[in-house]
Amino acid sequence: MEPPMEQSGGEQEPGAVRLLDLPWEDVLLPHVLNWVPLRQLLRLQRVSRAFRALVQLHLARLRRFDAAQVGPQIPRAALARLLRDAEGLQELALAPCHEWLSDEDLVPVLARNPQLRSVALAGCGQLSRRALGALAEGCPRLQRLSLAHCDWVDGLALRGLADRCPALEELDLTACRQLKDEAIVYLAQRRGAGLRSLSLAVNANVGDTAVQELARNCPQLEHLDLTGCLRVGSDGVRTLAEYCPALRSLRVRHCHHVAEPSLSRLRKRGVDIDVEPPLHQALVLLQDMAGFAPFVNLQV
């Protein structure tokens, strides 16, 4: 795209080259604007019509959009303008829009961007199954999705996601309290083979049935967050230890039915667990690592 002609505000030195005289497609867009924070670009477009055209062209070519880069809060009209021409997005994060973002705001954006691979909608409580259905059906390459604190996500919504997202690898369902074991079991059976990271934190409806099914169907699972899942117990953790060789981190804080013996096998494999071992176990580990046996009375 050629830069539009615009009158200079003053005289230009002979031989001088203005920023906008540089090739837009080959120089300014890939090598300049890509390194300028989005908030600064929005200010830049107020300078002149030419700068506005340049910024709009940049926005249309965006691959990644994070509303947090604009500010802690972003008005509905501003988001619509920013994403009006974007058709190549691969990453979309809209958490700062959580107070007002609706299906009507989101669905058109999803329809224009079928290449999306990562979508973050944490806390967006005004959405519904319709938005999730549009995402699942229209974005087959989706790999990462955050629906944390989206109370509207229920078993039916999750089933639709599991049926239509073959590339799904990371899923955050923190505090999606309508989800029960049956929905997680379905997810595991449909998409478990590719799942690497899953959060079911802060959901008292999730228990050992779901965890055991995840373990048996998710051989590549690396990160599992069960924080506050009060129905999860030692049986589920033992199954994880048996069937998940790739597991690297496990979060079980406030899971009061998970006992240390079920965690010890994972600890020996080097899995990062957010619950400290009992004092006796800690002293034994210290003895093994540093050879402090003569100085430690393990009977205390």
From Swiss-Prot:
Interaction with SMURF1 as annotated region, ranges: 113-269
Tissue and organ expression note: Expressed in heart, liver, spleen, bone, muscle, brain and kidney (at protein level).
Record flagged with keyword Lyase: no
Record's subcellular location: Cytoplasm
Cysteine pairings via disulfide bonds: none
GO biological process: bone mineralization; dorsal/ventral pattern formation; G2/M transition of mitotic cell cycle; positive regulation of BMP signaling pathway; protein ubiquitination; SCF-dependent proteasomal ubiquitin-dependent protein catabolic process
UniProt GO cellular component terms: cytoplasm; SCF ubiquitin ligase complex
Residue ranges constituting the F-box domain according to the UniProt record: 19-66
Keywords on record: Acetylation, Cytoplasm, Leucine-rich repeat, Repeat, Ubl conjugation pathway
Sequence ranges of the LRR repeats: 141-162, 167-188, 194-215, 220-241, 246-267
Pathway: Protein modification; protein ubiquitination
Residues with the N-acetylmethionine modification: 1
Keyword Repeat: yes
Family: Belongs to the FBXL15 family.
Subunit: Part of the SCF (SKP1-CUL1-F-box) E3 ubiquitin-protein ligase complex SCF(FBXL15) composed of CUL1, SKP1, RBX1 and FBXL15.
Function: Substrate recognition component of a SCF (SKP1-CUL1-F-box protein) E3 ubiquitin-protein ligase complex which mediates the ubiquitination and subsequent proteasomal degradation of SMURF1, thereby acting as a positive regulator of the BMP signaling pathway. Required for dorsal/ventral pattern formation and bone mass maintenance. Also mediates ubiquitination of SMURF2 and WWP2.
Protein name: F-box/LRR-repeat protein 15
Originating gene: Fbxl15
